[in-house]
Amino acid sequence: MGVTILQPYPVENKSGAQTIEFLVKRVLALGAVQVGHFLVDCETYTSIPQIGATKTVHILHNSEQPASVFSILDTGTKQIPLVTDGLFDLLMTRISPVYTSKKQTKIESKGPRFEFGDFLIKLGSVTMSQNFKGVLVEVEYRPCLVASSCWELMREFLQGFLGSNVSNTIPAYFAQRININTNHTKANDVYQPIDTINQYLEHFTNYRKQTTPVVAPRV
């Protein structure tokens, strides 16, 4: 895998399905070829008050890594990532007396998947409890493993079919420092699958907070 950038796309005077259809036409016009579909989902569990300070565990799955389960423990002061196999899902059901699932906040992004040269493009319709929340575009540049080395190329590519919605500056996620005592940021670090998961969690959290009604996708 390479470096992945996530970009929300505004739904203006269109349904979710119309927005996806519009973007599909743009992507196909580039010469991209559809290669199946994708799915990224997230379910959140919260610890019961009786065991002390509240902790949250986010469980995510990505169809690009079907054998892996990604979990992120949020202690309130820091986030601890963990990558395991599918048995972790079973473990979460076994500890349900301690961690309870917020079923109403289960969220996912799914849609068509395209290949265009060295780029992988995914057009995601984001839904939470079957309610449409927005459109999230994922672009991966597969030959590169360090975001700072290919951001300008990815920015130009993203702006080519998403327009001015794409900022000229690299997403804030990549500006995070790896070590508090250095200026080494995630943009200069080797990209890992957990970085894609962290970006999805960041956007999913924003969508969960969203209260403005969004036009539902047409079937």
Swiss-Prot record:
GO terms for cellular component: mediator complex. The keyword Transcription applies. It holds the Pfam family Med20. GO terms for biological process: regulation of transcription by RNA polymerase II. It is found in: Nucleus. InterPro entries: Mediator_Med20. Signal peptide: none annotated. It comes from the Eukaryota. Keywords: Activator, Nucleus, Transcription, Transcription regulation. Component of the Mediator complex. Component of the Mediator complex, a coactivator involved in the regulated transcription of nearly all RNA polymerase II-dependent genes. Mediator functions as a bridge to convey information from gene-specific regulatory proteins to the basal RNA polymerase II transcription machinery. Mediator is recruited to promoters by direct interactions with regulatory proteins and serves as a scaffold for the assembly of a functional preinitiation complex with RNA polymerase II and the general transcription factors. This is Mediator of RNA polymerase II transcription subunit 20. It comes from Aedes aegypti. The lineage of its organism: Eukaryota, Metazoa, Ecdysozoa, Arthropoda, Hexapoda.
